[in-house]
Design a protein with these regions (language model features):
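Catalytic alpha-helical scaffold of carbohydrate-active enzymes acting on polysaccharides/glycoconjugates
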Residues: 1-174
Length: 174
């Protein structure tokens, strides 16, 4: 083994978005830089969007001035008429959602979809499209690239019960 140089860096990518294949992999290959891609295996090959990307798409594309969203036991009115309003509202909603179980988070996402009237899909927001298994396989032929498991569905492990957390971790490796 060689010692790690003082100026060493690790190049990593999180989640498994398609731009890892269409943009990053080509650039990294051209300049000979290795990278590790941590992919959310349950999303690969689907047209699904991560919950956070669904929220961003709904609120960013909304033409409404405000929406009513139930965060826990509190129904709140969020201003979404201006760019600043959208950013502020997204920050509050995302922060709340990061600290709750997936089932409750899914209800909030459905609430936001209903309130905004925007039905998010990866065709609306190409930056949110996830890799296909074919793209992963192609990248995996490059010796510069390695892959690691993120988890299956990108849920916050600390808000899952033990069995759910184990499935998220082991399922992403299998």
């Amino acid at each position: 083994k060689r010692p790690i140089p003082a100026n060493a860096v690790a190049v990593t990518f999180d989640d498994g978005f398609t731009n890892n294949f269409t943009d990053a992999a080509q650039i990294l290959d051209d300049i000979g830089v290795p990278a590790t891609f941590y992919i959310t295996t349950g999303m690969i090959g689907t047209n699904q969007m991560f919950w956070v990307d669904q929220l961003e798409t709904c609120i960013n594309l909304s033409t409404k001035k405000n929406i009513e969203v139930c965060l826990g036991d509190n129904r709140q009115i969020f201003q979404v008429g201006s760019y600043k309003d959208k950013v502020n509202s997204l920050n509050v909603i995302k922060t709340f959602c990061k600290n709750i179980h997936k089932d409750k988070k899914d209800l909030i996402v459905e609430n936001v979809i209903s309130e905004t009237g925007v039905f998010p899909n990866s065709k609306q927001s190409l930056n949110y499209r996830v890799l296909t298994w074919n793209e992963v396989k192609q990248m995996n032929t490059n010796p510069l690239f390695s892959f690691g498991g993120h988890n299956v569905t990108h849920d916050t492990l600390s808000y899952l019960n033990h069995d759910e957390a184990v499935e998220q971790i082991s399922g992403s490796i299998n």
